[in-house]
Amino acid sequence: MAGHNESQSGAQPGLLFDDLSNDGAVTRVESIQVPPDDSLAKIMADVKASPVCGACKAGMPVVFGEGPSQAELMIIGEGPGVDDIHSGLPFQGPAGMLLNKMLAAINLARAECYLCNVIKCIPPGERKFSVEEIEDCRPFLLRQILSVNPRVIVALGALAAQTLLRSKETISELRGRVFTLRLNDREMPVLPTFNPAYLLRVAEKKREAWDDLKLVRELLKK
């Protein structure tokens, strides 16, 4: 889990609130301070140098992200798996293969998208992520979003969607809806859906995931 030290990275959480529009759409509004010369390379260096992250201090490998530095679609997962740690890249193994097929179904190649996770490391002992570790990682994720500046964000799985949107709803309640993230001077739609690893276990949810993918396709056409 990549931790966070505000004085080192220059990223500090700011105003946080939700705005409910007349049509019921939820806008998540946040402000975060970033270094003037921020970049994916700088964010990755800050992740690896984090003094508060137990995983980083223990020398756990970091899985930061993959894809073009400017991408129309940004895909955010929960945290790296064993296959990801071995390769240093997110969404490897069977779940990654399914994700590739999902993207191909809406005429997108993996190489066109920026992929990352909320959590950047596997915790020592491969235990579950703590709330503190998730919060330590979150500012790095927001900086990644600002750097990539995607047109659309897909949040895969409950942890990714809940962390990004500050929601306590389940992924089944969140999916199928388009949220808006207003981050500093940027505004982008966020669409939560099921994690491919979950779809491998619960195949009957693939129909709902396909409905979500069609919505992503429509958002990218706008």
Predicted stretch roles:
Residues 1-222:
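A polyanion-binding, active-site-adjacent surface
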